[in-house]
Each structure stands twice: as structure tokens, then as C-alpha cells.
Amino acid sequence: MMDYFNELERETERLYEIARKARARGLDVSTTPEIPLAKDLAERVEGLVGPEGIARRIKELEGDRGREEVAFQIAAEIASQAVPDDDPEEREKLADQALRTALAILTEGVVAAPLEGIARVRIKENFDKSRYLAVYFAGPIRSAGGTAAALSVLIADYIRLAVGLDRYKPVEREIERYVEEVELYESEVTNLQYSPKPDEVRLAASKIPVEVTGEPTDKVEVSHRDLERVETNNIRGGALLAMVEGVIQKAPKVLKYAKQLKLEGWDWLEKFSKAPKKGEGEEKVVVKADSKYVEDIIGGRPVLAYPSEKGAFRLRYGRARNTGLAAMGVHPATMELLQFLAVGTQMKIERPGKGNCVVPVDTIDGPVVKLRNGDVIRIEDAETASRVRSEVEEILFLGDMLVAFGEFLRNNHVLMPAGWCEEWWIQTILSSPKYPGDDPLNLSYYRTRWNELEVSAGDAFRISEEYDVPLHPRYTYFYHDVTVRELNMLREWLNTSQLEDELVLELRPEKRILEILGVPHRVKDSRVVIGHDDAHALIKTLRKPLEDSSDTVEALNRVSPVRIMKKAPTYIGTRVGRPEKTKERKMRPAPHVLFPIGKYGGSRRNIPDAAKKGSITVEIGRATCPSCRVSSMQSICPSCGSRTVIGEPGKRNINLAALLKRAAENVSVRKLDEIKGVEGMISAEKFPEPLEKGILRAKNDVYTFKDATIRHDSTDLPLTHFTPREVGVSVERLRELGYTRDCYGDELEDEDQILELRVQDVVISEDCADYLVRVANFVDDLLERFYDLERFYNVKTREDLVGHLIAGLAPHTSAAVLGRIIGFTGASACYAHPYFHSAKRRNCDSDEDSVMLLLDALLNFSKSYLPSSRGGSMDAPLVLSTRIDPEEIDDESHNIDTMDMIPLEVYERSFDHPRPSEVLDVIDNVEKRLGKPEQYTGLMFSHNTSRIDEGPKVCLYKLLPTMKEKVESQITLAEKIRAVDQRSVVEGVLMSHFLPDMMGNIRAFSRQKVRCTKCNRKYRRIPLSGECRCGGNLVLTVSKGSVIKYLEISKELASRYPIDPYLMQRIEILEYGVNSLFESDRSKQSSLDVFL
């Protein structure tokens, strides 16, 4: 593995050397690449927030302390440094630096919160003249996460004590101000993750020893105004996030660290931390259905199953090579059948977490469906699902959902009873004292290849009787979904005929029981035909009448010759969430170059159009040579070669026509009709990019982002193993890149061998690859035509990209992660190792991140282009992590299962609902490998899959053009799925989507501004003149169409389906309001002949 890391770092250094040569020519804002390298957490922290030299001290402390302890110690050391004359301003600066550095350590030196989430730290006075510490939080503190935000408040208290300050002593009005802000934030801005009671806010506001304050983040004003120590009358969103989603919500963790550090004044948190006591006799855990995920039903995104409803997804434990980190497996036949699930589509789920990404796994159970002709079939492959989809009348069972043990561990959710499956059955036999040691069934081979083992009904009963194990899952039906009475009715019906090759029965209402049990059968000539194996299993299991009982399976086991297990004791409810995505990153409108042209380029910001006007006046920054006083837009003076100094930006007249002509000549590009610039620069220095770069981007049809990098966004999906065939790369090329052996230790010779993915290798989407080919051509043109260097990439096809380096970056972070392209996928996603995603502080529950060619970022990125507003440094590669250390990344990846099978004890104990930590001793996961060579290799999977991109590549939601078609497909699907109540879906769409949307749009229409079509100026009210100052026409910013867009479809749904009368009346009242808004309410005089 060290050879792999060293090779990555050698190639990175090679790219840096090219970038250094290019930047040294002085044609950019800086003469050196502006993305520093960082090998570990300590270097990332120093590169992100400083101070200089802190990396060495962090590494010293890391040896014998946890990350949190290091953060507190570093904070105290920085803050308590000697200050001349105890200067308050210098002490404030040290306290500010201490808090930022400590927060950066807590967040792995990745997220932007230490830079953007803390506005400033001040030392202020209480009303008794004692001094205290105040932390000004800003909105981006959210990116730190609740725990880090909470600990930043605790660290501030630690700093307060280290520098000898008193505690914050709020007065009543200040406390009540917090209470009002929380209520206003939730009613006017957005919901908090945790909604505290007013008394909880009062307690926190009065007891926290430092002032948790902040900048105004919203225009909403409070009634507790003009407070002496609060500088704003607006809502302080950052402060509320730190207090509510931080300190209050994460109270147990804050209290834990406060006790460890022996910090006084935090005991009040125990009121938030005490777990409810169990009453006497409350030994058994009862897990109720959780309906939270269906509280908001969105139009066009179907509900696939109501909470714990029969026929929903069945829980199956295990991790496939493409699941984990919140991605969960579904059979590709289910995906093909539903069409709304593609590879990477998000699902909102009942448990164990809130959401996941769907990926295909074909070694689990697929759906059971009833066709229009009455047949009931199990669908076992995507091709069959595609063929019969139009014939499906009802989806009786959605199939399995493969959920890793780590998902329960991460969410601290009790284990749910496991579904009876083949891998459990095999382990049960192998552990049976009656099973011979010579393994007559060759189960040691099939224990990880159970899908290859075919067992007849006769053999299944013989094995069960001989080795005293439950009946094979193939012949165990969904008995728990029917009553004892229904099974007795079924038994009587079965006994009306004799089993020969098949069992042929008269068509009777009892057929519905067969359907619910999931027994495959055909309908032929008004007769029901059951295959020999299924008929044999039913008749033998139901050989005697069942005694009345509330537990059907228990009653069945009293009469069955072999033990019957519950096939699906846990059903998981779901609904479709966010669609998958793979798309180039574009600003709106999308520029080719960060060069300001004001309004001269029209609405398209077209530079050639602006150049036709000759000279233009724009606000721009320029550099001046201190030697010869020549003004330019370069870091080295084009006249004398001296370093230039960037001056203050201001309004300047520039000859754009001449600049454009010279730039085109410099890069030997003939006239282009469209090169898009920007209206104005939003950076502090307002220093523009060279026009040559925009010309070359336009030539190659690529677009720049706010920091001058070119990016492509994709949904994140995990991958620990792959085959050469599914990533479209030859065996020979993979061997060149270091993949010489498969995951079982055999020499790599075949396209279908399974290889273990290296931790910084990525599989990008084909769309991403095609875009990066164009980016590579742009970079080569830039090197050759602008910097006068040799071309580097020389790519013609996407296959030529294999082996090249990329930088991965998540939107809320400021540290990019080094990666290497290893292949391509047809899915709309970027597959990477769980460590890679965790290094960006992301998981795979539909998060999407960007990739950029590393050389493009090194050549073009500059901090000078970043917005000067709050949050401007988020989503920018301020530092590049070159090596992933599993111990220094987000700990969610530490929960990844690494076993080739789920231990038998997990299956057996799952029926007792234990906490995941209670069975952790039999689990092998990443956490147990940290600090060992095994943390990088040998991370096995329990379930294989044929292809990681099997099934639909694009979900139906994205394919259907109109909301009406989306909703009709949503309702049609609801009618077919047994686990869904169609009426509830219709009411849910109306209540949580359409009606609130229309009401909000009516409100927006009545409050809207007007906009000038010529200069884009906006007015709160129409000017008395009726036109803009520039003479342009004024138009509304909210159209009538946006107000009424859901009205007709709402009325149609209400008329077609029997919904609640109250909802019907709400629609009628809303329609009356809309008509009143757009039509005159005056009664019109009519002639008498209207009534004749």
C-alpha cells in the first residue's frame, strides 16, 4: 500500500512542477500554485487556519491523546500565550485563533466552519464590569455538524478559563431574545433539527458560560430590540445553530467532555441527557412503526411502502461490495419494475436511518408480483422485470433491502429481527451438532455462494428433518402475513385436489391467500396451477388443521413436520427521495471566464457583444509595477519583469475590444461568437482572470466555477471491490496501475475477477469522463498556447483518462482529496472507496460532490477569485489531502462491515432487539483494523452482485417532462403496490406539497418586486413613472403561472379519488382566492336575455 501512496505523491509532485513552471511566467494573479499539499490532519489544519508551525505541535500531542483532547489542549496553549501589557485586542486575536484551530482539529481540517462559521471572538464586559468571552457564530457553522458546533462552545469556555475571564452573565431581556429568535427561526426561516421548548432555551441561554452570539443571517427582525450587548435586531442564525443543534441537541456529548476536562458550570446539561427510566417488567423492547418519512410526500416521488406495512421491503443483513456508508442494496428487478429507482436514487426510509442511496444487488430476493392474467411469479432478474412490467397488476412483495450492520451501529438503532434467508440457513446447518464434519452438502463452498445452490422441496424437508434445522427459505412463505383461519381455509382448498406433476385447483377466493403468501402459481382455463415443489411444500407444511392463535407461525410450527421461520419479520417502509445526478457544475448564467463586463454583454454576458462597444467602464482590480508604474492584469510586469502589486479595485475604463483581440491572437484562436464573462467580480480584490483562458474554455465547451476551476458533480456511491469488465478497463491497463491480484490472492488474468479497490481510486460516470476529456483538452491548449509549455494529457477518448489524478471536493468543505481515475460506470454516480467519501466528510445517502482534473485546479485556482461574502471560502480547494489515513477521516466509515458473512449470532439475537454495541464482539469492521495494515486491505463483503450499475440508469422522475405525468405515474404505482394506501398518497401530495406551494406562491405574488427587462434592476414598488430609470420595461418577478400551476392537477386528484372533505374544501377556498387575485370580484351587469 505504501508503494501506491508513494506513486500517487510522485505523480502529484509532477503536476505541481508543471503548474509551478506555468505560474512562474507571471500571467496569473499569483506566481505559484495556490493549493498547498497536506499529508495528514495536522498539515490540513495548519494549511486551512494556521497558525504557522502548529502542525508539529498537533503531531506531538496526537501520540497519546484523542482528537478532542488535542483540540482542547491546542486551544488553551494558543490562547494563553504571553501578550505585551495584556493588550485586549491581542488577547482577542489569540482567542479567535485558538477557537478556529481547535474547531479545525475537531472537523479533520476539512470543512469550512473554522474559517466561515466563526465570524469573530471578542472579549466584552458584563454589567458588573467583569470581562467575559463572546463567540460570534455565522451560518456556515452548520457545516461543522452538531457535535463539533457544540464542542466549539465548550472549547470557548476552556479558552475563557485559560485566559482568566469571568463567565457571561445575561440579563432577562437577553435570555428572552434567544427564546424569541428560536421561535422566529422555525416559523419564518426553516426548521431546526431539534425543536427545543422555551424553558430549554432559557436554561441554556442563562447557563452557558460564554456568550453565544453572531452575525445577522436573515432579514427577520425581533421584538426584543436594541439590546446594549447585541449588535443586531435581526435573527442570528449561526448562534441558534450552535446553541440548539449544538449544545442542547448534543448535551450528552458536551457533558461527557466537560466532566473529562473537569470544567465546572455544565452540570445543568444533565436535564437534557438523562435517559428515560424503564418501568418494572419493561424488559422486552417494542419497536413501533415510524411514519416520519411519509410526513412530507412530494408530487412525482412515489411512496413505495407505508411504515412496516406487509409487502414492503424485507430487511436483510449484509454488505455488498457496492453498499455501506448509507447506500443500501435492492434487487435490480425491483428497480426495473418500479422505474422510479435508478442506480443512486435516494430513498427516504423508515429505519435504521433517515435516507439511503439505492444500488443494485442481485444475490438477494427480488419482487413477487401478480400479473393481469392472475399468475403470481417471483422475478429474479432485471430482464424478466422489464418484460413483464406492463402486465403487472399488483406488486405483492417489493423484495429485499440489504442493510449493513454498520448502518444500525451508526444510527444506534436496535437490531430488528432478521429475514429468514439462504446464508442464515446454511450457517444453521453448519452449526448443527447433527451435521457431519465431512460436509456432505459441500456447504463450506456454498456459504458465500448460496445463490448457486438449488434445493428441491423434497431435499429441503429431508435436510431439515435429518439435521434438525428450519425449512429452506425458498419453501418458507410469508405465513405471518395471514391469519390462522386463512391458512385453514387454504389447507381445505389444497385438499380438494391430488398432487401429481402439478397441483391443479378450482379457481376460488382462497387464491388471494396464495398471493399474499407469495406462492408462485399460474391461472389456466379458470384453474389455479401450482408447481410441484411449491405444492409439495405447502401440503407437507399444512398437513394438519391449525389451532387458533394470534401468532400464525407459532400455530404452524405445532403441526408442521419441520420448523418454520418467519420469512419477513421486519418490513421497511420507504418513499422515493432525490433523483441521482451526474452533471457539469455551472454557475447561473454559466461563464467561460471570470472577467467583468457589466451589463454591456447583455443578459448572456457575452464578451464579443460587449467588445463591439469598444471601451467599457467596469469595477475591476489591476496590478501596478512598483518599478515602472505600468498597470496590468498580471503578477509580473509585462514591461520590466518585476513583481506587481494588486491595488484597490475601482471603476475603470478598459478597451475590451483591444484586450479581446490581443487575447485571441495570443492563443491563436479565430473569432468565437460566444465567450461568456461575468457581470461583476464578487471577490475582495476584483482581480479578473486572463481573457485567454475564457477563449480556450469556450473553444473546448467547458465552463468555470467561482474559483476558476472546472468541475463535474455526481452522486456519491461506495465501492470496495470491482471487476475490470464493469469499469470498462482492460486487464493489462489495470496491471500497469498496480492491480496484479484479485481480492482472493489469485493473479489477475480475467475481466470478471473481483479486485479490491484502492482507497484513492475512483470510478467516474461516463458523462463525467466525456466532460473531463474536454477539460483535459482545454488544459493542454492552455499549457501550449498560453503558457508556452508542452501538452500534458493528450487524451482523445475517455479511456485515455485512466490513471490520471483528480481532486474530489464536497460543497461544505475547503479541503480537496487526491484521487485517481480507475474506470467508468454507466450509472449517474461517482463510485469511490468509503474512505474517500469520508475524507470529504460525506456519506452516500444521496450526497453529491465534484471532481476536477488536478492540473486544471493547480493552474487556475486562486483565492483571489473567491467571494468576499460570508461563506465564500466554502467549496474551494484551499488545501489538498494527498494521503488518506482511516484514523483521521470521518468516523462513519469506521462502521463499515468487513466480513464475508454475517455471524450466526447476529441473526439469532436480532429477535431480542439488542443494541448494536451488544453484539459488536462478533462483528469485524474497520474500527477494529485501525492502525494496522489491515485497515487498507482485506475489507471483504458478504454479498456479491453481478454488476454495480445493473438496472435503470435514470429514474422515471427525471424522464417524465411534466408534473402531471409524474403524479399520474406516482398514483398508478401506488395502486399497484400492496404496501401502499393510494388514498393516503393523494392526500399526502395535496397536504404536504401542492397546497402549501400554492399558498406560498399566492403570498409571494402579493409581495413581489418588479424587474427591468433591460438592465435587470429590481424595484419593491412600481415607480410613479411606470418605467425603469434606464427607460426599460418593468415586468413582474412572480408570474400567474407559478401561482396556479398545481391548481388544476389538485382539483383533478380531488375529483378522481375519495379524499377527506376538509381537503376538498381547502382546494375550493384556495381556488376562490386565486380567482379573486387574478379576476375582478365586481358583479357584472347582465341583460335580461341571459336568464331567458
Swiss-Prot record:
A Pfam family the protein falls into: PolC_DP2_N
EC number: 2.7.7.7, 3.1.11.1
Role description: Possesses two activities: a DNA synthesis (polymerase) and an exonucleolytic activity that degrades single-stranded DNA in the 3'- to 5'-direction. Has a template-primer preference which is characteristic of a replicative DNA polymerase.
Coiled-coil boundaries: none
A GO biological-process term: DNA catabolic process
A molecular function (GO) term: DNA binding
Oligomer and partners: Heterodimer of a large subunit and a small subunit.
Protein name in the entry: DNA polymerase II large subunit
HAMAP family, alphabetized: DNApol_II_L_arch
Reaction it catalyzes: DNA(n) + a 2'-deoxyribonucleoside 5'-triphosphate = DNA(n+1) + diphosphate; Exonucleolytic cleavage in the 3'- to 5'-direction to yield nucleoside 5'-phosphates
Family: Belongs to the archaeal DNA polymerase II family.
Record key words, sorted: DNA replication, DNA-binding, DNA-directed DNA polymerase, Exonuclease, Hydrolase, Multifunctional enzyme, Nuclease, Nucleotidyltransferase, Transferase
Natural source organism: Methanothermobacter thermautotrophicus (strain ATCC 29096 / DSM 1053 / JCM 10044 / NBRC 100330 / Delta H)
